[in-house]
């Protein structure tokens, strides 16, 4: 092995980065009012696994539980909704998927 080191070639300047697409001002989404948890707003509403009518409004047509950011529930009530839906599915009060989906 030789003790000689080879010199690295001197770095050249980097080429200019291409401009990002749409370098103009960004379009903003219109202001959307924050959703309010319907269970916090109306204290008379109760989350119950035996009431499939209320639970179906929190399930998609494919049978998935609607997320918090879409339903507008607070985290505490979203957890209760999730537990109630799972209990109702377990004892067959609501179907796991409303229809058979062929993909």
UniProtKB/Swiss-Prot annotation:
Family, per entry: Belongs to the bacterial ribosomal protein bS18 family.
Domain of life of the source: Bacteria
Cellular-component GO terms for this entry: cytosolic small ribosomal subunit
Basic and acidic residues: compositionally biased ranges: 1-19
Keywords: Ribonucleoprotein, Ribosomal protein, RNA-binding, rRNA-binding
PROSITE patterns, A to Z: RIBOSOMAL_S18
Bias-annotated ranges (Basic residues): 24-33
Function (record text): Binds as a heterodimer with protein bS6 to the central domain of the 16S rRNA, where it helps stabilize the platform of the 30S subunit.
Start and end residues of each stretch annotated as Disordered: 1-33
Name of this chain's protein: Small ribosomal subunit protein bS18
InterPro entries per UniProt: Ribosomal_bS18, Ribosomal_bS18_CS, Ribosomal_bS18_sf
Assembly behavior: Part of the 30S ribosomal subunit. Forms a tight heterodimer with protein bS6.
GO molecular function: small ribosomal subunit rRNA binding; structural constituent of ribosome
GO process terms (BP): translation
């Amino acid at each position: 092995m030789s003790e000689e080191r080879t010199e690295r070639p001197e770095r050249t300047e980097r080429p200019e980065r291409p401009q990002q697409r749409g370098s103009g001002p960004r379009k903003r989404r219109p202001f959307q009012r924050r959703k309010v948890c319907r269970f916090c707003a109306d204290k008379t509403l109760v989350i119950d696994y035996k009431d499939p009518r209320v639970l179906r409004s929190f399930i998609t047509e494919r049978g998935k539980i609607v997320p918090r950011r879409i339903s507008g529930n607070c985290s505490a009530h979203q957890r209760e909704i999730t537990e109630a839906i799972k209990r109702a599915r377990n004892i067959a009060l609501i179907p796991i998927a409303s229809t058979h989906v062929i993909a």
